[in-house]
């Protein structure tokens, strides 16, 4: 028996994994590098070395999350608290699973992992020691261990010595469920959670993001019940300690816009907001790389080096990367430890209370302005609406931009009813005197996407206060307050009507989008608080 770094096999046997004879426990980056490039590896386990020093892997047919294969055990722990897909008006991915089917899936995964050489990574989710989850990840694939080492908070040697996992993630990517039809499931693949056992099981999908977003869903369950905001957002802090958070769905610009040489990064995707301020859940970043260039996004480009892990990019024979090639997926990605970005909050990824709250949307209709300043009611309305365009490739089967409404800019990861997140966020914003803004990083009447240069200038105007002092006019139908001019921004684009050949073209599209907003918000009108917010939305 050869056990690395002293994790006793009995610890894994307690989860149902048998015949444990080789554990690679909390492997170093150097060891993972050797393992991933082992010439004997085949299929999706195999890594390829790129000219930038980072290893690249393929995740197979799953190049994004598979929300239709997500299940939560419905039992006494979750029955009355979880936001269930089969109850109420709201649409979500929290499909109930019986304890019996859970046991069957657990058997599949533990049999898959039994008798194998296993990688075990112990890490934290959450930078606040009072509320963090201690998570143990178990996988037979080296690069999956590398992914979680990048993405979660790496414990010190001292913390590892006393590490007691609160949550177990068993990744059996190589196994599938042949009995899925009889069990009434979506497919042979599964991503299942049990809050009583505090465990996640993965089968059939190799996509690393299932482990990252799985733990985000769990934080989204545990923290708001304690009055702590749990947010699908990036965050950064200025020289004077001013904190900004950027909400948005995948591909709307959270990572790009929060990675700013003038400000220190707190994190790029998942945060909490408690009595002390804003804190990161993660220890790394997961950036989209499609059409990445050193000129447009130097910080992210320079983060792609040894210890970073690329997913689904095209690597040429000579090891160079074609970042423009989306033939495998538009959702090409790189994970890297957060310290690959030079300008970060140290030693712990947390800061004070946020004073600027930015909602990012990628409007495929070309109706919304590039920026508007929201009232308190509009803040709640647009947070609960969570409008964007679903961008290509972040979920399976989506290749063209399509409009979507995702509550709290992250409905796929919500474990409680959206109004619970809105209540906690509003409470935190009011206490901090925070102001919210809606920023469209999508399209306008030209048919082109608003440039990163213009969007960055808009973000600068929000953060330095010049937008708050700007003269504004009101966009009809949506009743949004828009600045008449901003430094460094082409004035013609501020009013979206000006980007069309005629204002009637905008009007026609605006009516279509306004109706979608109104129809979507109907699901919140069954409470007095929700009904009161209707006035903050568009009017036909």
Curated annotation (Swiss-Prot):
Keywords assigned: Acetylation, ATP-binding, Cytoplasm, Decarboxylase, Gluconeogenesis, Lyase, Manganese, Metal-binding, Nucleotide-binding
Catalytic activities: oxaloacetate + ATP = phosphoenolpyruvate + ADP + CO2
Residues modified to N6-acetyllysine: 87, 523
Binding site for Mn(2+): 213, 232, 269
Stored Gene3D superfamilies: 3.90.228.20, Phosphoenolpyruvate Carboxykinase, domain 1 (3.40.449.10), Phosphoenolpyruvate Carboxykinase, domain 2 (2.170.8.10)
Physiological role: Involved in the gluconeogenesis. Catalyzes the conversion of oxaloacetate (OAA) to phosphoenolpyruvate (PEP) through direct phosphoryl transfer between the nucleoside triphosphate and OAA.
Lineage: Bacteria, Pseudomonadati, Pseudomonadota, Gammaproteobacteria, Enterobacterales
Quaternary organization: Monomer.
Sites where the protein binds ATP: 213, 232, 248-256, 297, 333, 449-450, 455
Cell membrane found in the keyword field: no
Cofactor binding summary note: Binds 1 Mn(2+) ion per subunit.
Pfam families: PEPCK_ATP (PF01293)
Family stated for the protein in its record: Belongs to the phosphoenolpyruvate carboxykinase (ATP) family.
GO BP terms: gluconeogenesis
SUPFAM superfamilies (alphabetical): PEP carboxykinase N-terminal domain, PEP carboxykinase-like
EC nos: 4.1.1.49
InterPro entries reported for this sequence: PEP_carboxykinase_ATP, PEP_carboxykinase_C, PEP_carboxykinase_N, PEPCK_ATP_CS
Binding site for substrate: 65, 207, 213, 333
GO cellular component: cytosol
GO terms for MF: ATP binding; metal ion binding; phosphoenolpyruvate carboxykinase (ATP) activity
Organism encoding this protein: Shigella flexneri
UniProt protein name: Phosphoenolpyruvate carboxykinase (ATP)
Membrane spanning residue stretches: none
Protein's pathway: Carbohydrate biosynthesis; gluconeogenesis
């Amino acid at each position: 028996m050869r056990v690395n770094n002293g994790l006793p096999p009995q610890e894994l046997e307690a989860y149902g994994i048998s015949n444990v004879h080789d554990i690679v426990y909390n492997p170093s980056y150097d060891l993972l590098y050797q393992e991933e490039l082992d010439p004997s590896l085949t299929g999706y386990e195999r890594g390829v070395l790129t000219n930038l020093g980072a290893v690249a892997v393929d995740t197979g047919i799953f190049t994004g999350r598979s929300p239709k294969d997500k299940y939560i055990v419905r039992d006494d722990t979750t029955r009355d608290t979880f936001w269930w897909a089969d109850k109420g008006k709201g649409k979500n991915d929290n499909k109930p699973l019986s304890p019996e089917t859970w046991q069957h899936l657990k058997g599949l995964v533990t049999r898959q992992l039994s008798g194998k050489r296993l990688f075990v990574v112990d890490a934290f989710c959450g930078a606040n020691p009072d509320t963090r989850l201690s998570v143990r990840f178990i996988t037979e694939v080296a690069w999956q261990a590398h992914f979680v080492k990048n993405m979660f908070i790496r414990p010190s040697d001292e913390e590892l010595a006393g590490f007691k996992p609160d949550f177990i993630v068993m990744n059996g990517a190589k196994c599938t469920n042949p009995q899925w039809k009889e069990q009434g499931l979506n497919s042979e693949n599964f991503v299942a959670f049990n809050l009583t056992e505090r465990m996640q099981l993965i089968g059939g999908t190799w996509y690393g993001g299932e482990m990252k977003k799985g733990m985000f869903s769990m934080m989204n369950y545990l923290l708001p019940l304690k009055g702590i905001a749990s947010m699908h957002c990036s965050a950064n802090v200025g020289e004077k300690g001013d904190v900004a958070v950027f909400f948005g769905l995948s591909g709307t610009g959270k990572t790009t816009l929060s990675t700013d040489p003038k400000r220190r990064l707190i994190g790029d995707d998942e945060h909490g907001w408690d009595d002390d301020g804003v804190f990161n859940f993660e220890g790394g970043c997961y950036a989209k790389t499609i059409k990445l260039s050193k000129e447009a996004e130097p910080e992210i480009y320079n983060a792609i080096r040894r210890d970073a892990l690329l997913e689904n990019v095209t690597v040429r024979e000579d090891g160079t990367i074609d970042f423009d090639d989306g033939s495998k997926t538009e959702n090409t990605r790189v994970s890297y430890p957060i310290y690959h970005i030079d300008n970060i909050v140290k030693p712990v990824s947390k800061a004070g209370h946020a004073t600027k709250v930015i909602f990012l949307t990628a409007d495929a209709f070309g109706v919304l302005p590039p920026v508007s300043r929201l009232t308190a009611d509009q803040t709640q309305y647009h947070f609960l609406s969570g409008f964007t365009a679903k961008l290509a490739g972040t979920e399976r089967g989506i290749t063209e931009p399509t409009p979507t409404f995702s509550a709290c800019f992250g409905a796929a990861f919500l474990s409680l009813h959206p109004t619970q997140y809105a209540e906690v966020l509003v409470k935190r914003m009011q206490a901090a005197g925070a102001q919210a803004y809606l920023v469209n990083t999508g399209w306008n009447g030209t048919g082109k996407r608003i440039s990163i240069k213009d969007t960055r200038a808009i973000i600068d105007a929000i953060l330095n206060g010049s937008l708050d002092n700007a003269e504004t006019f009101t966009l009809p139908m949506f009743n949004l307050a828009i600045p008449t001019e901003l430094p460094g921004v082409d004035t013609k684009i501020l009013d979206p009507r000006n980007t069309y050949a005629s204002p009637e073209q905008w009007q026609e599209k605006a009516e279509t989008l306004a109706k979608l907003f109104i129809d979507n918000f109907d699901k919140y009108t069954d409470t007095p608080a929700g009904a009161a917010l209707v006035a903050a939305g568009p009017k036909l």
